[in-house]
Amino acid sequence: MPSDREGLWMLAAFALMTLFLLDNVGVTQAKSFDDVRCKCICPPYRNISGHIYNRNFTQKDCNCLHVVDPMPVPGNDVEAYCLLCECKYEERSTNTIRVTIIIFLSVVGALLLYMLFLLLVDPLIRKPDPLAQTLHNEEDSEDIQPQMSGDPARGNTVLERVEGAQQRWKKQVQEQRKTVFDRHKML
């Protein structure tokens, strides 16, 4: 029986393989109008307003004579009009854009789920902190030692190590407060 981690890896591998197969199927249709185009931007010319023309042409045919149809100027002004037009060949992969967006949204969604999980589990894991209660009651911390559950050398789990680090940090902060406020000394 596979563990949860192995199951997640298998699911991720299956999802990547599915995306790869869908991408390969889409390659046959990839050269659509949205992926490959010739874009000509023509400024205003005499009494004709400016216009942007988008057509599906090859890179070698990407010029004003092929893309601008119907030609808005009479035959003798075509060359002058086309010299003003700026034509660019543009190519992009919508499948790559889609896959990138899907991966980005998946990562953001996983992080949000993890955050919600931590928000729900955190109150269940936290124990009342006797050190924090002493700070609120303004009692002297030298008389009260923080209670450690179990053997101090046992801190094997991440949670126990984090709680130990928090206890040490809180003790340091309390000592600093005592030094500054009671003894009026700066560090």
UniProtKB/Swiss-Prot annotation:
The chain crosses the membrane at residues 10-27, 99-121. Its main location: membrane. It is found in: Membrane. It is a multi-pass membrane protein. Keywords: Membrane, Transmembrane, Transmembrane helix. InterPro entries: TMEM9/TMEM9B. It comes from the Eukaryota. One of its GO terms (cellular component) is late endosome. Belongs to the TMEM9 family. This is Putative protein 2. It comes from Takifugu rubripes (Japanese pufferfish).
